[in-house]
């Protein structure tokens, strides 16, 4: 079991149960999955770009991503149906907790001019989204070996019913919220 998973079971779940007055431990919100999504619009012109994005996301997540394809053709963007346009990976279980640990402890503090993450990026249902502008904040990516700076979206899905519960959960995992 990873460090954060132990921390959740021993400390966070107990604290949240006391704070929100849950009757059962199963009511306590938990992180169910983390989805990493990298949209690569440059892949329309050059097919090699998607391979670089897949290798970057594989290094970051620790598992092979799925290549996302366009659903329908859009002439204005010069894309046809089933064109590779990005890649995504869903993390659950131990890999999810290990990624969360690296994100909070190593990657986020490496962001240039970092003052904390926004507390307003919740979706109203207890899920949180973080946009990362550069993939080089992760220690697995070597600066010399990348072809271009690419951003990615990190979507943290929780079992919390409200944003307040989700924020309390992520704060317990020492997420550096600005407000």
From Swiss-Prot:
Keywords: Ribonucleoprotein, Ribosomal protein, RNA-binding, rRNA-binding, tRNA-binding. PROSITE patterns: RIBOSOMAL_L5. Belongs to the universal ribosomal protein uL5 family. GO terms for cellular component: ribonucleoprotein complex; ribosome. The lineage of its organism: Bacteria, Pseudomonadati, Pseudomonadota, Betaproteobacteria, Burkholderiales. This is Large ribosomal subunit protein uL5. SUPFAM superfamilies: RL5-like. PANTHER family: 60S RIBOSOMAL PROTEIN L11-RELATED. It comes from Bordetella avium (strain 197N). GO terms for biological process: translation. It comes from the Bacteria. This is one of the proteins that bind and probably mediate the attachment of the 5S RNA into the large ribosomal subunit, where it forms part of the central protuberance. In the 70S ribosome it contacts protein S13 of the 30S subunit (bridge B1b), connecting the 2 subunits; this bridge is implicated in subunit movement. Contacts the P site tRNA; the 5S rRNA and some of its associated proteins might help stabilize positioning of ribosome-bound tRNAs. Part of the 50S ribosomal subunit; part of the 5S rRNA/L5/L18/L25 subcomplex. Contacts the 5S rRNA and the P site tRNA. Forms a bridge to the 30S subunit in the 70S ribosome. Pfam families: Ribosomal_L5, Ribosomal_L5_C.
């Amino acid at each position: 079991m990873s460090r954060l998973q132990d921390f959740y079971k021993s400390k966070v779940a107990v604290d949240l149960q006391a704070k929100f007055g849950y009757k059962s431990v199963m009511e306590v919100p938990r992180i169910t999955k983390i989805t990493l999504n990298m949209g690569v619009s440059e892949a329309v012109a050059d097919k090699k770009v998607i391979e670089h994005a897949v290798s970057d996301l594989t290094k970051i997540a620790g598992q092979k991503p799925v290549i996302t394809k366009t659903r329908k053709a859009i002439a204005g963007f010069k894309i046809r149906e089933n064109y590779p346009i990005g890649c995504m990976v869903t993390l659950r279980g131990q890999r999810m907790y290990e990624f969360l640990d690296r994100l909070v402890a190593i990657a986020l503090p490496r962001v240039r001019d970092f003052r904390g993450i926004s507390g307003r990026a919740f979706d109203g249902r207890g899920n949180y989204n973080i946009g990362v502008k550069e993939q080089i904040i992760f220690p697995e990516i070597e600066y010399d070996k990348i072809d271009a700076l690419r951003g990615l979206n990190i979507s943290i899905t929780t079992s919390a019913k409200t944003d307040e519960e989700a924020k309390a959960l992520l704060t317990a995992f020492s997420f550096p919220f600005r407000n």
